[in-house]
Amino acid sequence: MSKISKIIARQVFDSRGNPTIETEVFVKNVSASAICPSGASTGTYEAFEKRDINNKKYLGKSVLKPVEFINKVISNKLKNFNVHQQEKIDNLLIRLDGTKQKKRVGANAILSVSIAVKKLSSKIKKIPIYKNLLINKNFRLPYPLMNIINGGAHANNGLRIQEFMIRPDKAKSFSEGVRMCFIVINKLRDLIKKMGHSTSVGDEGGFAPMINDNESALKLIVKAINLSGFKNGKDVAICLDVAANELLKNKKYSIHSKKHTSVDKSIDNYLKLINKYKIKSIEDPFGENDWSAWTKLLNKTKNKIQIVGDDLFVTNLERLKIGFLNISANSILIKLNQIGTLTETLEVIKFAKLIGYKTIISHRSGDSEDTFIADFAIGTDSNQIKTGSLARSERVSKYNQLLRIEHELGKKSKMHIID
């Protein structure tokens, strides 16, 4: 028998020291738990994160009310449900909330239950989580998008762009990809030290040096790649997360300097950076409602680089369909807490693959030691994973889980494809 006997939720803390929800689901004496992450720069259309805004003991950031709702309501509603019936369970959770953006129960409460159910199902079946998610029979490992310099909302320096990342495009295995990133990161650390800057890290483990312009950061990264013995744009690619929602004012953007400029000027500046620094991926280059700007950039780049929608799509099927019709992007970032259940997330991934989009599984800036997204990336045959740098254990834990899976798969293990 695989009937859920009880569900216990508790308040724990994420990597930024903020309260979050951990939910443990039981089938008799067997249990599995999941911790919900939290974002810093969030899209307007994301599912709602419920907090106790009137609880002054935790400065309005506690999650004690959603924890209580799980323990008193969801636990009773899901009792005796078959733990393997993920879709049925998720649909009940969606109905319990009854709002478009999960504002009644909160996506943080719902997701912690949804993931814990899948983990427990895998445990009872005695199979790895990624095999319990399998979209197809491939066991392909994703390319890591490693955040090596933090800016924007993830750091307190003057950088406009939120994340400067590297991707080891010529890696023949996941472990080789991590090794390549490791070398570049160490060379970058040495360069930052020589400049007299601190090598302290931001929320996602990337360095946060006190430099004030995007090009200075890009030049540093190119130098680190070269010193590592790699070719920029071939062996290792530079990728950006602009988080342009944070830089939008009166239909103008302050992406490339503090001065706000038009969409056309911003696109010209992007094209210069792409050509000069061989950038292969740009996430959220424009605001979440600026569909025409996205389309212009995609056309100007002739679909030759990865244009990734995060705040644009918020892991939402309706938003993705609009983006597809507008020809706005060619890739989607997948964040489970943006939509709130595994079932809804899988629907988005399946549609993205159907229309030829690359899927990139992502952490959040407020994350935890939970490694579920590592299995999720392989189980959904996603092209890339974005889960920070080789620093901070809540980031490294995901890479370590992928290394374990690669080792377990042995000769069956292979890397995904980077076009």
Where are these regions (language model features)?
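Metal- or metallocofactor-binding catalytic centers and their adjacent structured scaffolds
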Residues: 37-127, 131, 178, 206
